[in-house]
């Protein structure tokens, strides 16, 4: 059965949206993982009694002041949280559009049978 051009177009949009949604979900997951790693690092630093910690810089460990590193990590964590929130909003919008397109396509294709 040959699909009408408008249905083919909707199907193409649906597939593109599906790919975009997967990419957004993957990126969000990456940022969430980085955020958890940073939270774990801050947690470990708080357990430490030393005023200094080692920070990875270009493949080497550099001794740094613990409070400065905690401040840097806190700032990075805030940025990560904002990015995750942005991805969540994008994902939500795409999920809604995806469901609408899926429903539309099911109706149109269902009528053809």
Swiss-Prot record:
The keyword Cytoplasm applies. Keywords: Chaperone, Cytoplasm. One of its GO terms (biological process) is protein folding. InterPro entries: PFD_beta-like, PfdB, Prefoldin. GO terms for molecular function: unfolded protein binding. Pfam families: Prefoldin_2. Coiled coil: none annotated. GO terms for cellular component: cytoplasm; prefoldin complex. It is found in: Cytoplasm. The keyword Chaperone applies. Molecular chaperone capable of stabilizing a range of proteins. Seems to fulfill an ATP-independent, HSP70-like function in archaeal de novo protein folding. Heterohexamer of two alpha and four beta subunits. Belongs to the prefoldin subunit beta family. This is Prefoldin subunit beta. It comes from Methanococcus vannielii (strain ATCC 35089 / DSM 1224 / JCM 13029 / OCM 148 / SB).
């Amino acid at each position: 059965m040959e699909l009408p051009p408008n249905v083919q177009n909707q199907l193409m949009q649906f597939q593109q949206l599906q790919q975009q949604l997967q990419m957004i979900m993957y990126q969000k997951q990456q940022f969430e993982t980085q955020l958890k790693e940073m939270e774990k690092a801050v947690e470990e630093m708080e357990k430490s009694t030393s005023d200094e910690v080692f920070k990875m810089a270009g493949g080497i460990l550099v001794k740094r002041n613990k409070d400065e590193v905690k401040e840097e990590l806190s700032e990075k964590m805030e940025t990560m949280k904002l990015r995750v929130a942005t991805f969540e909003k994008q994902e939500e919008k795409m999920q809604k559009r995806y469901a609408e397109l899926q429903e539309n396509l099911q109706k149109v294709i269902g009528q053809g049978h």
